[in-house]
Amino acid sequence: SQALPKKAMGAFSHWSNPNIGGIDDRTKKQFVMYDLSLAGYGGRYGEDGPEALSPVMNCTNIPIEVHESLNPIRINCLELLQDSGGAGLWRGGCGLRKDIELLNSKAVLSHLADRHKFPPYGVFNGKAGRLAETLLIRGNEKKVLSSKGVEDLQEGDILSFRPSGAGG
């Protein structure tokens, strides 16, 4: 960043790809919902970081209608996480929260994410983005999930994916 300060940018939010799978109660066939959690890019010289993008080229947001028509789930929330990007002269882009409710009797979550412990750094006095968080909401209980792992799910469970914002 010192050699080419006008080319440096704050750290990207993070990568997260939750997978939910099982036997669909409606069809008795296997299903796998593979998702991409979209997040922000870091602030860079002259502009704020873009919001809700994938770090992988040629990948875009999978429409809610596609997920809901192919899988026994419902998307209850899809919104930018306001102020999740790091502050700075040019702020980091925000992450995109997604809450997924399981409509099936059971399923399994395989979760792989980052930035749950170490926030995306800022550059040139820009601040770090907010830490990522993944919640399992079962009834009135909220359980914070680790960034990597496998979790058994039951009908009515809500998974809340809250990616970090990028560095400013």
Where are these regions (language model features)?
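Glycine/proline-enriched, intrinsically flexible loops and inter-domain linkers
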Residues: 1-168
